[in-house]
């Protein structure tokens, strides 16, 4: 793969997980909060995971965090003002959850050393144009598969890692992110992401 310079992030090494604002993605949340994935995150040197889990999913998110064995903690992370964010601790790993963030791309730009995202094109673009390493998790429960087609095509071009909502696949992708460097998104996105997607789909 082509190499790209990774920007140095200040503060705790953070992975930002975005599940989409409107439709919850339980499979991705389940995978992220699995103890094996949390352990892999710690093994990869992360000390904080921020999870944007979507509206209407707060109670279930808190239940799953508790089931993983995390304990409630104070939330003092920057950039989350007005998000009603809550924090937990799991063996030294800080877990922060919130339903929605109005400036998700900005949060990714300032906080993320790695992004784990659902396969919505907007979220993919948020991460790629910030030149962040990106793991895209395809929601197989959706009726159409255009998101999977886009994610797999971008993976083939070396821009991201595409997986299913599976604990083993996510843990494996996290490990790969420590060994591999992705190709940056070309300047073509400035002409409009729709044009870029059309171009990618027909290569």
UniProtKB/Swiss-Prot annotation:
Gene Ontology biological-process entries: dolichol-linked oligosaccharide biosynthetic process
Disulfide bonds: none
Localization (cell): Endoplasmic reticulum
Catalytic reaction(s) noted: an N-acetyl-alpha-D-glucosaminyl-diphospho-di-trans,poly-cis-dolichol + UDP-N-acetyl-alpha-D-glucosamine = an N,N'-diacetylchitobiosyl-diphospho-di-trans,poly-cis-dolichol + UDP + H(+)
Major site of localization recorded for this protein: endoplasmic reticulum
GO molecular function, one term: identical protein binding
EC nos: 2.4.1.141
Pfam families for the chain: Glyco_tran_28_C
Keyword annotations: Endoplasmic reticulum, Glycosyltransferase, Transferase
Assigned GO CC terms: cytoplasmic side of Golgi membrane; cytosol; UDP-N-acetylglucosamine transferase complex
TM segment ranges: none
Subunit structure of this chain's protein: Heterodimer with ALG14 to form a functional enzyme.
UniProt similarity note: Belongs to the glycosyltransferase 28 family.
Function: Involved in protein N-glycosylation. Essential for the second step of the dolichol-linked oligosaccharide pathway.
The protein, known as: UDP-N-acetylglucosamine transferase subunit ALG13
Origin species: Eremothecium gossypii (strain ATCC 10895 / CBS 109.51 / FGSC 9923 / NRRL Y-1056)
Designated gene of the protein: ALG13
